[in-house]
């Protein structure tokens, strides 16, 4: 039993509801909702119009395809790193230009995809100072890349900064020195960057999973997991950390274009022929002493020979250790690093060179010569690699006179290095020439400014004992070559 007037109240509510429906737009959809969750009072067409950029026709992207439209309002979302914002999701905090790795070159702020430059700066990335106090010469010098080419021949120099040539409007040339050209990534057939299957960075394509090729033009018919499995070496590393896995096959790095020491090969790049350098025998000018073959960096010795370098004959009554010990003498190296040890006896090298001699090749009279071949500066004699100077002279090569006709002031002025320091603080001055400290054997050079430890070594010897270290570089004696003078180019060894 309803109270009196309840029936009249229901009639009033019903009539108001139907009046509201008749006043609503004909295309009103109860499924549209406002941000508050209440039904949207806009038609679908009007809601979408408000979510489109001005001037865009019906059916075009809503919210720049970066969000969803709710009752005429864009709710932006993220589909890649960064944040979308703006009334129509038209702004992105990563789209501003960068220069030298900095957004707006660090001289402005990013405002909806465009740099707002600080006072005194201009350019799309705020990279150009409005006033330039550099000379053209200095400006051009600052614009040179590592090959000394101004703006990589792909732009012009403005006050020490490169402006890349992007007259086509695509902006594919960029970088501090315009060194990056993403046109290299465009597929000739599809005219798409990386064939539409990868990202381009500085002219190189980085392909999506399942695609490979210089421009991601080839599709792989195996799963990424299977591809990785096929490329994994026995030690569990993909391509032994020496190559790139492409669709289940390893492309090994080209580590030695000269071919001097071999390359990397094998199904999983497990074989590094550079390791053969450790078994190269400079006295036989061959790997494995000429008595074996280097395979994957190790010697496979022929019958009758054994050892790391196949250097020990099996018919020798001495063990390898005994043989090496007899050849060492007082040196840490067999035959003082200047000869071949076989069955406890040293054969000094180079062959036929009487300047290297001794039971363990301990004497090397080449050390008494300068680069012109003059022994002890013409002022002494050589005895087992050391100069015995004539009266009135001293020094490693008898290069210093004991009497000096200079004043101390004149002498010191000739011993000062470029920074004004006397003999670089590592030696003493005598008659206008620096005598480097004997306590630090590795200090050398006209002003004691060189460190002989910077020279290459082989078999534990600087310049392999076959040359002179000259300020970090090996100057090899006749018949020897290589960064460490380790390669014999003279007559064939017997």
Curated annotation (Swiss-Prot):
GO terms for molecular function: integrin binding. Residues 40-90, 91-127, 132-179, 180-217, 220-270, 271-311, 316-362, 363-399, 404-449, 450-486 form the I-EGF domain. The keyword Mitochondrion does not apply. GO terms for biological process: cell adhesion mediated by integrin; cell migration; cell-cell adhesion; cell-matrix adhesion; integrin-mediated signaling pathway. X repeats lie at residues 455-494. III repeats lie at residues 143-184. This is Integrin beta-like protein 1. It comes from Rattus norvegicus. The lineage of its organism: Eukaryota, Metazoa, Chordata, Craniata, Vertebrata.
């Amino acid at each position: 039993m309803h109270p009196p007037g309840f029936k009249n109240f229901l009639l009033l509510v019903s009539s108001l509801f139907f009046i509201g429906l008749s006043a609503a737009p004909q295309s009103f959809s109860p499924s549209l909702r406002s941000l508050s969750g209440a039904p949207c009072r806009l038609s679908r067409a009007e809601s979408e119009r408000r979510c489109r950029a001005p001037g865009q026709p019906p059916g075009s992207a809503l919210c720049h395809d970066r969000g969803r439209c709710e009752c005429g309002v864009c709710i932006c979302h993220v589909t890649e790193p960064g944040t979308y914002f703006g009334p129509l999701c038209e702004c992105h905090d990563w789209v501003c230009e960068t220069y030298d790795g900095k957004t707006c070159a660090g001289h402005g702020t990013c405002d909806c995809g465009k740099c707002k430059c600080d006072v005194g700066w201009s350019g799309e990335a705020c990279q150009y100072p409005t006033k330039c106090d550099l000379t053209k010469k200095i400006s051009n010098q600052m614009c040179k890349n590592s090959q000394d080419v101004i703006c990589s021949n792909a732009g012009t120099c403005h006050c020490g900064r490169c402006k890349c040539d992007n007259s086509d409007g695509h902006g594919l040339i960029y970088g501090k020195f315009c060194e990056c050209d993403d046109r290299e990534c465009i597929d000739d057939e599809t005219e798409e960057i990386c064939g539409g299957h990868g990202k381009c960075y500085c002219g190189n394509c980085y392909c999506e999973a399942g695609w490979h090729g210089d421009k991601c033009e080839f599709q792989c018919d195996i799963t990424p997991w299977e591809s990785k499995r096929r490329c994994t070496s026995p030690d569990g590393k993909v391509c032994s950390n020496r190559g790139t896995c492409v669709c289940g096959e390893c492309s090994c790095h080209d580590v030695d274009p000269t071919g001097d020491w071999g390359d990397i090969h094998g199904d999983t790049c497990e074989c590094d022929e550079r390791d053969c350098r450790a078994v190269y025998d400079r006295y036989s000018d061959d790997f494995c002493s000429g008595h074996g073959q280097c395979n994957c960096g190790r010697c496979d010795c022929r019958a009758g020979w054994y050892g790391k370098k196949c250097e020990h004959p099996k018919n020798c009554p001495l063990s390898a250790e005994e043989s090496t010990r007899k050849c060492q003498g007082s040196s840490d190296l067999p035959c003082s690093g200047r000869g071949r040890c076989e069955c406890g006896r040293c054969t000094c090298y180079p062959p036929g060179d009487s300047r290297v001699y001794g039971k363990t090749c301990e004497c090397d009279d080449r050390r008494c010569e300068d680069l012109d071949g003059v022994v002890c500066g013409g002022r002494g004699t050589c005895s087992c690699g050391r100069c015995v100077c004539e009266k009135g002279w001293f020094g490693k090569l008898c290069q210093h006179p004991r009497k000096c006709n200079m004043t101390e002031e004149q002498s010191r002025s000739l011993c000062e290095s470029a920074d004004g320091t006397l003999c670089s603080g590592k030696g003493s001055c005598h008659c206008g020439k620096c005598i480097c400290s004997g306590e630090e054997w590795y200090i050398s050079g006209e002003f004691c400014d060189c460190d002989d430890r910077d020279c290459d070594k082989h078999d534990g010897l600087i310049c392999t004992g076959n040359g002179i270290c000259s300020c970090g570089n090996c100057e090899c004696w006749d018949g020897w070559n290589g960064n460490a003078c380790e390669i014999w180019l003279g007559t064939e060894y017997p």
